[in-house]
């Protein structure tokens, strides 16, 4: 809701990175029907599902580590849940690429799983698949974002239950390109 309320124009251009099945896409459109969204995901299956869930949105198969290939500029970028799968180096590149894709004054929304980066490890997801998950603290991001010229707008920590009944804390941040 906070991200949606940041835009004064009626039809801001929004890039969603790592859209998955399009749940965030659908939420954004429900809150701001004027959003002009281009949504990307590395998985063809996820893009097909997202298209079914959001027929009015422009979807593209694209790895979040390759967004520099996009030539359009955006008022906002949303990256709901890619950073847990990106190394520090890939996160830095993602932030740099996002900075270049944003118009002046544009906003970047992203989330990560809070924790000590050195404790990053393989985890089993809800589908039973194992993948490597990276943990981050807000301070892990702050220095890189400051260097690029982003200004912190919003930060919150939110607990989410895991499959094994434990909880993990997600960091949700919004920064603005100066």
Model features per residue range: what roles?
Residues 105-112:
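Conserved beta-strand signature within the Rossmann-like core of class I S-adenosyl-L-methionine
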Residues 92-104:
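A short glycine-rich, Lys/Arg-flanked "PGG" loop and its adjoining helix->strand segment in the class I
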Residues 150-161:
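Conserved S-adenosyl-L-methionine
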Residues 1-11:
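Conserved alpha-helix/loop element of class I SAM-dependent methyltransferases that forms part
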Residues 15-17, 21-66:
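Class I SAM-dependent methyltransferase SAM/SAH-binding core
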């Amino acid at each position: 809701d906070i991200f949606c309320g940041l835009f004064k124009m009626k039809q801001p251009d929004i890039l969603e990175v790592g859209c998955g099945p399009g749940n965030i896409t659908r939420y954004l459109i429900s809150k701001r029907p004027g959003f002009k969204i281009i949504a990307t995901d590395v998985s063809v299956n996820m893009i097909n599902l997202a298209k079914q869930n959001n027929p009015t949105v422009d979807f593209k198969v694209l790895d979040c580590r390759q967004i520099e290939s996009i030539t359009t500029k955006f008022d906002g970028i949303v990256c709901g849940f890619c950073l847990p799968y990106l190394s520090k180096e890939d996160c830095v590149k993602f932030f740099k690429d996002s900075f270049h894709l944003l118009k002046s004054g544009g906003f970047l929304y992203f989330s990560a799983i809070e924790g000590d980066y050195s404790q990053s490890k393989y985890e089993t997801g809800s589908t039973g698949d194992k993948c490597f998950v990276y943990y981050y603290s807000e301070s892990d991001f702050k220095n890189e974002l400051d260097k690029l010229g982003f200004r912190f707008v919003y930060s919150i920590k939110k607990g989410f239950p895991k499959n094994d009944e434990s909880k993990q804390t997600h960091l949700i941040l919004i920064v603005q390109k100066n």
